[in-house]
Amino acid sequence: MKKTAVIVFSGGQDSTTCLIHALPLYDEVHCITFDYGQRHHAEIETAQRLSKQLGATVHKVLDASLLNELAISSLTRDNIPVPTVNSSGESLPSTFVPGRNILFLTLASIYAYQVKAETVITGVCETDFSGYPDCRDEFVKALNKALELGMEYKLRLETPLMWLNKAETWALADYHNQLELVREQTLTCYNGIMGSGCANCDACNLRAKGLNAYLENKTQVMDSLKSKMGLK
């Protein structure tokens, strides 16, 4: 029986690592990128390029522009500054887009239903993240149950990075011999700068700290990754 997965794909470090990891595990991997009026259109262009370069079966860009009207965030509004690493903390940073993962995972699951995919993959992570509530394991499990009930369809929301720290996420890219591609060709920066980014926003800070931690202790981090994910 053909195994098919759908990936919520932004062209950033996490979703690209998920794509790299999924490709040898599934017969078909479909990438879904959402155009929600995000601050930097380069995100969509990067996702299109990487999905083709890495060999995804299908890549679709879906219009989710309604989210831009409803969700006010520094990632959807040019007049709201992206916070720096040293910004004093609110309970949620201004980069949080309320409802984004709810909407994206729901739409990806509807697409999965149509193509008879059994898995929807997302790169959310509870270990190293910016405090977003929709990156938590309990949220994903609750939404998974709701989607199965609402569509009467057996579906798994898979989160391969959920319990990895950023160093281990870098190790996973290296495990698949794609460390340099992820390092140089993905777009994680909230200010829209490719690769290492601006070095000033929270996304770049997490990414750089994780990479440094991995490069300083590759063997130990790789062993930890293999233990967590059951890799050989």
Swiss-Prot record:
Zn(2+) binds at residues 189, 198, 201, 204. InterPro entries: QueC, Rossmann-like_a/b/a_fold. Its EC number is 6.3.4.20. The keyword Magnesium does not apply. The keyword Ligase applies. Binds 1 zinc ion per subunit. Keywords: ATP-binding, Ligase, Metal-binding, Nucleotide-binding, Queuosine biosynthesis, Zinc. GO terms for molecular function: ATP binding; ligase activity, forming carbon-nitrogen bonds; zinc ion binding. Pathway: Purine metabolism; 7-cyano-7-deazaguanine biosynthesis. Pfam families: QueC. GO terms for biological process: queuosine biosynthetic process. Belongs to the QueC family. HAMAP family: QueC. Catalyzes the ATP-dependent conversion of 7-carboxy-7-deazaguanine (CDG) to 7-cyano-7-deazaguanine (preQ(0)). This is 7-cyano-7-deazaguanine synthase 2. It comes from Pseudomonas fluorescens (strain ATCC BAA-477 / NRRL B-23932 / Pf-5).
